[in-house]
Amino acid sequence: MDYLPIFLKLRDLPCLIVGGGEVAVRKLGLLLDAGAAVTVIAASAEAVIVELADRGLIRLRTKVFEATDSEGFRLIIAATDDRAVNAAVATAARRHGIPVNVVDCPDLCDFIFPAIIDRSPVLVAVSTGGASPVLARQLRTRIETCIPSRFGTLARLAADLRERVRQAIPEPRARRHFWERTLEGPAAELALQGRAEDAERVLLEAADAAARQERPAWGSVALVGAGPGDPDLLTLRALRLIQEADVIVYDRLVSAEILALARRDARRIYAGKERSRHSIPQDDINALLANLAAEGNRVVRLKGGDPFIFGRGGEEIETLMACGIPFQVVPGITAASGCAAYAGIPLTHRAHAHACVFVAGHLKDGTLQDLDWSQLVQPHQTVVVYMGLQGLPQICAELIRHGAPPSRPAALIQQGTTRDQKVLTATLETLPDKVADAGIKAPTLIIIGEVVGLRKKLAWYRSRQETEGRSGNG
């Protein structure tokens, strides 16, 4: 280990930066974040440094550095573009026993700056010992995705309530077990959502229950949008909740790759629906979610796309609210957005479509339900049809019957955003026969409008079939 990783308290301590360029500005920001009293010495300085000096936030000395300028500081940074000046700063600092950092010159450094993940008061520092700052930044980026943005809120909550929890649970081992459970429970999740007051209430209720040696109600439900298929399109919160879940209740649009992200010991319950054949009635799904949470489980209700766009998420949270079950909703990339993007079809375009309409195209008793055809045939808009595969012939026929030109472009996307994506482009008149000849199966999405014609020049994603030379682009 070439460097000892430590965190240095610099609040109100005098620190010196020599240099006034962009690098100096970056180092200045770090020192100010740490509360240091900063002096900058530079022959000329960036406007932001001058502004900070004018506001009295730093001291700026416009001059050439001299060895005597280093006296009286607790930490010095050399950030000029002149190697000789930087070396002189390092020599002067060492003569006075002051730790010095020379930017981009590890051999002259007493300390180095790591890549920082700041979730104050939680800080994570990553360093390669100066070997490769770029590699350190890349590693920081990976770690960033693992630490929720409001992790500091959770840390502050634990700090603020630490003494009250100690009084409620005086026995150290019991208190440690309490914190281990709590920092992965509903109170923690509320804090990570930014709901600090609710988190405090739930945490104190749990502490009181633990003091009485009662089992607290730890369960909760998260309605999570799994996106259109590609696992890389999951949100960071969705990924975290999937990996933390005790039980996952999922539908048929959730891919095996996404389910594989869950813990191995997580219970998986299939609740998919295929046309009118439901594996579990919706009312039973609603009750199942509430019952699983009441048993103390962290439940993820995992839905393809977005839970509030043709996902019946509203019905499920009504039941949870009625039962007093803590819940949250995590939006996902809906199929319309994801599939259109991967097919190279913009849903809006200044020259072609000023509006976009989402409709459900599933059949009930062999007929389409309650669609406003006069609105759907209007020009300069894009119509996106979910669940429309079986009703495609009727949808196209009704649009033509109500005034849409038979030549209006239309596309059907099968398994959008996945390696097996297939895109068929045609017109309202020809798409049904083309789909029938291709043997298309669900899940699919239908896009109707002039924007479909842009696919010829905007298509960028190549599925496995297209890569092998069997493109479905018509």
Curated annotation (Swiss-Prot):
Q: What job does the chain carry out?
A: Then it catalyzes the NAD-dependent ring dehydrogenation of precorrin-2 to yield sirohydrochlorin. Finally, it catalyzes the ferrochelation of sirohydrochlorin to yield siroheme.
- Note the superkingdom of the native organism: Bacteria
A GO biological process of this protein is: siroheme biosynthetic process
InterPro entries documented for this protein: 4pyrrol_Mease (IPR000878), 4pyrrol_Methylase_sf (IPR035996), 4pyrrole_Mease_sub1 (IPR014777), 4pyrrole_Mease_sub2 (IPR014776), CobA/CysG_C (IPR006366), NAD(P)-bd_dom_sf (IPR036291), Siro_Cobalamin_biosynth (IPR050161), Sirohaem_synt_dimer_dom_sf (IPR037115)
Q: Write the gene name.
A: cysG
Q: Where is this region: Precorrin-2 dehydrogenase /sirohydrochlorin ferrochelatase?
A: 1-203
User: Which protein family is it in?
Assistant: In the N-terminal section; belongs to the precorrin-2 dehydrogenase / sirohydrochlorin ferrochelatase family. In the C-terminal section; belongs to the precorrin methyltransferase family.
MF annotations from Gene Ontology: NAD binding; precorrin-2 dehydrogenase activity; sirohydrochlorin ferrochelatase activity; uroporphyrin-III C-methyltransferase activity
For region Uroporphyrinogen-III C-methyltransferase, the annotated ranges are 219-474
Q: Where does S-adenosyl-L-methionine bind?
A: 228, 304-306, 309, 334-335, 387, 416
Instruction: Write out the catalysed reaction.
Output: uroporphyrinogen III + 2 S-adenosyl-L-methionine = precorrin-2 + 2 S-adenosyl-L-homocysteine + H(+); precorrin-2 + NAD(+) = sirohydrochlorin + NADH + 2 H(+); siroheme + 2 H(+) = sirohydrochlorin + Fe(2+)
Q: Where along this sequence does the record place binding of NAD(+)? A: 22-23, 43-44
Q: What is this protein called?
A: Siroheme synthase
